[in-house]
Structures are given as C-alpha cells and as structure tokens.
C-alpha cells in the first residue's frame, strides 16, 4: 500500500510531560548549536492534555533544569504545598495522626512542591515547544512501527474518518508514514507501540514480567470552610492500602 510520507529528524510519539520535555530539549539544543533539525510530536488526543486526567503534586527540580524561567513564562504551578499531613485510618470515623519524620519518609515531605493540573501543565509545555519551532499534531494515532534493517525508522498513523462498521466516511483520511532519524516513544505505560518493539527485539526474554498497580481518582466537592488550599495528606489503613489527597486552588478547577 502506498502512503504519503513525512520526514523529520526527530519524531516524538505522545504529548505527555515526558514527550513534550524531550521535544523541548531537542529544540533547545537546536538553538544552542545553531542547527535546524526538524522536530515533530504526535498526540492521539483531540488536543494536548485531552487524555491527561490526573492532578499532580509536582516536584519542580527537572523543570528548573529544563526551563529555568518557568515562573516568568507563567507555568501553571500556582498552588505551592503549604502543609503535609499523614494519618492512619482505623475506620470511617477514626483516624490517628502520624508524626511526619521527614528523614525517614522524605517522599512525604512536599515542601517546595506544587499542586497542579497535569493537563494544564502539558498544554503549557506544548506552547513552549511550539515557540521553539516544534510541530505538534493532535488527533493523530500511531498504529504501528516501521522497522527496516532492524532499526526503528518511524511510525504509521491510523486511518481517520472510519465508522464503527469499518465504512469510510466523507471525512476519511488514509494512514500515512512519519519517518525520522530518531523516534522517541512516549506513549505511557503498556503502550501498543512499546509492545511491538518488545516483541520485535525480544526485550522481555528472560526478564521478570512488569508489575502494575491500579489507582482510582476521585474529585470531591467539599464545603468552603473545609477547603485548605495547599494541603497534601497521605493515609494508610482503612479501607484499603491508603491514598493521597490534595486540595486544588478551588474545589472545582482541577480539570
């Protein structure tokens, strides 16, 4: 099957924090070395951030290194953590406060961290990437990898405008090849392209299987008098193994 082909120097699959940070770093190196390598990011969501549902307690060390002037550029890190709380839940009515020994549990110390929407952060990263010359294409899925001479040469996008019955709609667009000298897969946990790479090169041979945990996210509306901006709480005990709670700037803006 003949397909249209677009070629880049760097192709990043997935516009999450890792993929966008990768594209930004490549673009910064372009500027530093006075080069003009083409960089493309594709994202399956209708827009950057569309598939990023999580809030986040964000540790900014990596961002300080990548974009030192992020405050001047108005990165959406506007809720600094003000208080950490650790509690053991006995049941639905009783909890026991646990002193916070930062030396023994440094991950429970969020001083200097920020509460934020990860989707908004990705949108901000996308704007930064585009300002550096990165091309970002949202709404494009990557259906398969292109392997030639045992090297990853790019990806094939999925067809667009196909009905549930497999019929081509008036908006149909055929798949195309995106080829690059360097292809970076940033599609997240258990991505289907990653599975293809693992199978092709037997990367899991004689390896222990990966382990995964299931987490559930809930957004709670609480009474304004109970809302304490910048609070992070870790729990253990009832009803399962524990949870992480944090307050947004207001009860409804952690989209």
Where are these regions (language model features)?
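Conserved N-terminal/central alpha/beta ligand/cofactor-binding core
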Residues: 3-5, 35-164, 174-182, 192-195, ...
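N-terminal Rossmann-like FAD-binding beta1-loop-alpha1 element of flavoenzymes
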Residues: 10-35
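Glycine-rich, N-terminal phosphate-binding loop of Rossmann-like dinucleotide-binding domains
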Residues: 15, 187-188
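Secondary-structure boundary motif
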Residues: 28-32, 131, 253
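Active-site catalytic pocket residues across diverse enzymes, especially alpha/beta-hydrolases
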Residues: 29-30, 197, 201
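Extracytoplasmic/periplasm-facing segments of secreted or lipoprotein envelope proteins
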Residues: 170
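Flavin-dependent oxidoreductases
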Residues: 199-200, 214-245
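Single conserved hydrophobic/aromatic residue that forms the stacking wall/gate
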Residues: 246, 251-255
